[in-house]
Amino acid sequence: MRVALLGGTGNLGKGLALRLATLGHEIVVGSRREEKAEAKAAEYRRIAGDASITGMKNEDAAEACDIAVLTIPWEHAIDTARDLKNILREKIVVSPLVPVSRGAKGFTYSSERSAAEIVAEVLESEKVVSALHTIPAARFANLDEKFDWDVPVCGDDDESKKVVMSLISEIDGLRPLDAGPLSNSRLVESLTPLILNIMRFNGMGELGIKFL
């Protein structure tokens, strides 16, 4: 499967690129600047070895993929989705986006509606799937890291959700869990500021989640 990581130059994009590429998937790292995407793709290839990882501008990456993952900072994500609307409308689009604000008392969820629902509205698409919000990105980007985390997944299109859950399940240590329709995304996204607050107030490192 060809997976585009739009804005895939951060830790979540790096982790997905390395782990999915070593499983045999074709990875396209997207960025607003092609040279940055190509440089990151070359960096990832050096780590992953004989793997298919290329770099392109976001527009070209979106055009080339079967699945697009919005590994973009929240503040730029909606503009990017709007710019790529005509390309992404018919694609499966994964949203790990979380609107988070940091204040004196900690982290808060900063949106009336879920990021995933906003993306779906912008794209006019039912194929948006909400997932990967609670992945500790720096740990995930380290191939030596061993983990056992659950990944809640929300979506309205059952087939798109099944494809994304199947892809996630290929990564050793991740268990996708169906968390219902896209309207539940706000519940899942709000786990991220909760985790960040637990880390902050307890002096803990990056945390994932596991339902027992």
Curated annotation (Swiss-Prot):
One of its GO terms (cellular component) is plasma membrane. Keywords: NADP, Nucleotide-binding, Oxidoreductase. Its EC number is 1.5.1.40. It catalyses: reduced coenzyme F420-(gamma-L-Glu)(n) + NADP(+) = oxidized coenzyme F420-(gamma-L-Glu)(n) + NADPH + 2 H(+). It comes from the Archaea. Homodimer. This is F420-dependent NADP reductase. It comes from Archaeoglobus fulgidus (strain ATCC 49558 / DSM 4304 / JCM 9628 / NBRC 100126 / VC-16).
